[in-house]
Amino acid sequence: MRVTIRRSGSGLSAYVPKKDIEEPIVKVENESLWGGFVVLRNGWRLLLPDLPEDTSLPVTVEARKIVNDAARKETS
């Protein structure tokens, strides 16, 4: 799914146009943000693509929504 990641005064957020929702990112697997999963305030886990650390925001990427079992396998 397409997701726009942006930085606001309160931190990072993700906008999902297909669902018309914007949620703050509350947890990041990798400090560089890219190539790992993020957790949104609504509980969604999104697997972000591997991009360069210096990628400027906002940016629209193709992310994958993962369920809890898949997230555990990804991080094991």
Curated annotation (Swiss-Prot):
The signal peptide here is none
> Could you tell me the Gene Ontology terms of the biological process aspect for this record?
nitrogen fixation
Q: Which UniProt keywords apply?
A: Nitrogen fixation, Plasmid
Could you tell me which Pfam families the record lists for this protein? NifT
The record's comment on protein family reads: To R.leguminosarum Sym plasmid FixU. Also to the N-terminal of R.meliloti MosB protein.
In Swiss-Prot or TrEMBL terms, this protein is called Protein FixU homolog
Lineage, highest ranks first? Bacteria, Pseudomonadati, Pseudomonadota, Alphaproteobacteria, Hyphomicrobiales
Gene name, please?
Answer: fixU
